[in-house]
Amino acid sequence: MERAAKKEAVEQLNETFRTTGVAIVAHYSGLTVAQMQTLRKQMKQAGASVKVSKNRLAKIALEGTDVVAIGSLLKGPTVIATSSDPVAAPKVAVEFAKTNENFVVLGGSMGKTVLDVNGVKALASLPSLDELRGKLVGLLVAPATKIAQLSTAPAAKLARVVQAYASKDEAA
């Protein structure tokens, strides 16, 4: 790899690390190309990305970012999964590790908070931002729906009573 290409790779990685919400590091030794493609596809569907780069270049790119703590995990054949959603990358990584024994999650970082394997698993068990937003909207809409039902209920009852009297008079 030429010096200019290395510099470009470091700049791209640095940009990724500066804008990410979470970074997960895992060993991928022994994965087939098809398995790596599956991992990349699953990460992309979840809104995350996977990077495989030279550890030395990744450590240089980590300098000056919030996720600098993951530099100590970069030993051997490592892959770095990143996402702006703090739950997306950990969730996919942990699920992928369950089905592929050659993929081993080492740890990660959420902002300046360092995560060990258990921290990554705990983060993966949380609901995603979209799920939380859906629940919040549901909680906000529910009272308005109940108020609307309560305000229309007396009028509906009155209409049914009038209808009952009208049908009673017609029958008589």
Curated annotation (Swiss-Prot):
The keyword Hydrolase does not apply. Coiled coil: none annotated. Transmembrane segments: none annotated. The keyword Cell inner membrane does not apply. GO terms for biological process: translation. Keywords: Ribonucleoprotein, Ribosomal protein, RNA-binding, rRNA-binding. Signal peptide: none annotated. CDD domains: Ribosomal_L10. Part of the ribosomal stalk of the 50S ribosomal subunit. The N-terminus interacts with L11 and the large rRNA to form the base of the stalk. The C-terminus forms an elongated spine to which L12 dimers bind in a sequential fashion forming a multimeric L10(L12)X complex. Belongs to the universal ribosomal protein uL10 family. Forms part of the ribosomal stalk, playing a central role in the interaction of the ribosome with GTP-bound translation factors. This is Large ribosomal subunit protein uL10. It comes from Nitrobacter winogradskyi (strain ATCC 25391 / DSM 10237 / CIP 104748 / NCIMB 11846 / Nb-255).
